[in-house]
Amino acid sequence: MKGIGDPWGYAEPSVKRIHRKLFRLTDKIAALEVELCQVTAELEYHRSINDDAQRDAAVGNYIDREEAGATSADVRRFEKTISDLNGRIEKLSGKRDRLLASIPE
């Protein structure tokens, strides 16, 4: 039921609930995007270290090859984290889009 000073129906409990969910989803998406930005920057750092380690391993001894394996594993771990974060962001964005479509007009 619309209130006297509420021409858009925001007093409806279902609309309030949808709006609260939308705000929470938007906050979660924003936090994940910040985390994604940080992880991407770290990945670039680890890729640089990995490039150096791979070059050292090509001309170095067994210790250099072990370090190259470790840095390569770090790069793969960060790439997986980025992939997971992108998947979570896409999932939450889809959920947000469905909620936006369900808002009564």
Where are these regions (language model features)?
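Short, glycine/alanine-rich amphipathic alpha-helical segment
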Residues: 59-81
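Short, charge-rich amphipathic alpha-helices with coiled-coil/heptad character
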Residues: 1-28, 103-105
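Extended alpha-helical coiled-coil "stalk/arm" regions
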Residues: 36-60, 64
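Generic structural concept
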Residues: 19-22, 26, 47, 68, ...
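A short linear-motif detector with a strong N-terminal bias
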Residues: 9-10, 35-37
